[in-house]
């Protein structure tokens, strides 16, 4: 066989083998090889408008324990409008990733942002403390849900700028339910907002009531042994929260405020760094802020926290609803004409949230259709126009669900 032909045959045979080897799945990263049993929290700022974004690290903080799984370091899905990834700097190997949402991501879709008004928002991100230097990368989804890098920085765990302070001893900790090791359970934490120094017993009772509401519904009811529940109490100078439309402003621990994005019933916190600092007194995976007020309302930032008032008759239902956003990454299944979001779910793009879909083959199909019962899909039934806040066709689950009501 001529040498040229031999070389060609070698390439034809070898290249597919090389490509197959390169495409072979890599073993999951070993926690003990790359991380220590602590957490590293990155407190950052996002600033910009609808067309621009700047990410700045404010500080890095060591937390005393990594409470999450040691095996699910790279999840099979990336919920959220952002994803952050941690690469081992020496080998460039991906060793950790998480999807997340931010208050800034919601702001970018509002009319002020579209008009060019620049605002700054806080966000805290957390991952296991690495043993060696890592590359910290943040990626953002575009309107077609494709990810693009927006920030990267080398982080050295030996950096003396990393804060290693102890949690405040003045905060009171309540543990109504401990089912096991934080590394093996979901650690649910309630935080006090708008409770005066003399309201500690009321906060305890509110935590017990909300815990009962949570484990009174599925899927939490059947999985309650998978959860630890703790609460952290820090007194506020005044009771309640800010209500800007009523010209009412209160000095509180976490700065909760209604009228987020100019929506009267939408309550959020802009003190995300402080919220995570307060939560770090205990192991935490899921955060819920309880606001000492009889007013109806609440809010959430997906994959970060939820917040609700406690003394309205519907407060337990609002809490479970908002938890569906923050913990489950679910979309709203209703439409309000007063919403300030523009093109939050662009037409023709499949939403990231698992409970809504834009798939055209679901349109017009009845849940009673025999073919519907066997059709592969994420949702369990088609709903009305307007699911997920946007004003165009999006299929959604059935009417009587917590994320709708």
Predicted regions and their residues:
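Short pre-active-site segment immediately N-terminal to the catalytic Zn-binding motif
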Residues: 202, 299-322
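Active-site-proximal segments of metallohydrolase catalytic domains
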Residues: 229-302
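Fold-level signature of zinc-dependent metallopeptidase catalytic domains
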Residues: 160-221, 231-241, 260
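Catalytic Zn2+-binding segment of zinc metalloproteases
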Residues: 323-339
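N-terminal prosegments of processed precursors
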Residues: 23-122, 353
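Bacterial N-terminal signal peptides
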Residues: 7-18
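Extended acidic/polar, glycine-enriched regions
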Residues: 114-182
């Amino acid at each position: 066989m001529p040498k040229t032909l031999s070389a060609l045959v070698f390439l034809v045979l070898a290249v597919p083998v090389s490509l197959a080897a390169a495409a072979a799945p890599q073993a999951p990263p070993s926690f003990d090889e790359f991380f220590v049993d602590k957490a590293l929290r990155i407190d950052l700022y996002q600033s910009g408008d609808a067309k621009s974004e700047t990410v700045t690290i404010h500080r890095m903080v060591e937390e005393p324990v990594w409470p999450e799984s040691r095996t699910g370091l790279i999840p099979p899905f990336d919920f959220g409008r952002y994803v952050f990834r941690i690469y081992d700097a020496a080998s460039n190997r991906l060793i950790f990733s998480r999807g997340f949402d931010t208050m800034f991501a919601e702001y970018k879709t509002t009319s002020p942002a579209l008009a060019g008004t620049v605002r700054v928002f806080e966000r805290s991100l957390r991952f296991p403390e690495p043993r060696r230097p890592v590359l910290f990368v943040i990626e953002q989804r575009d309107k077609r849900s494709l990810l693009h890098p927006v920030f990267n920085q080398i982080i050295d765990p030996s950096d003396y700028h990393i804060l290693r302070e102890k949690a405040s001893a003045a905060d009171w900790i309540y543990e109504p339910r401990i089912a096991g090791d934080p590394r093996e359970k979901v650690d649910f934490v309630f935080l006090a907002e708008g409770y005066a120094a003399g309201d500690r017993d009321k906060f305890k009772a509110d935590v017990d009531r909300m815990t009962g509401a949570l484990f009174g519904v599925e899927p939490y009811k059947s999985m309650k042994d998978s959860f630890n529940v703790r609460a952290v109490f820090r007194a506020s100078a005044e009771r309640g929260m800010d209500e800007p439309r009523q010209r009412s402003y209160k000095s509180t621990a976490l700065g909760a405020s209604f009228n987020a994005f100019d929506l009267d019933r939408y309550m959020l916190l802009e003190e995300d760094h402080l919220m995570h600092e307060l939560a770090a007194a205990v192991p935490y995976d899921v955060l819920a802020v309880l606001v000492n007020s009889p007013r109806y309302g609440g809010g959430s930032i997906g994959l970060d926290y939820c917040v609700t008032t406690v003394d309205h008759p519907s407060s337990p239902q609002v809490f479970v609803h908002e938890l569906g956003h923050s913990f489950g990454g679910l979309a709203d299944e209703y439409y309000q004409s007063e919403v300030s979001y523009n093109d939050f779910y662009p037409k023709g793009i499949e939403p990231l949230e698992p409970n809504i879909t834009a798939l055209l083959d679901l349109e017009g199909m009845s849940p009673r259709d025999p073919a519907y019962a066997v059709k592969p899909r994420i949702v369990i039934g088609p709903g009305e126009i307007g699911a997920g806040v946007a004003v165009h066709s999006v299929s959604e689950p059935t009417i009587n669900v917590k994320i709708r009501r």
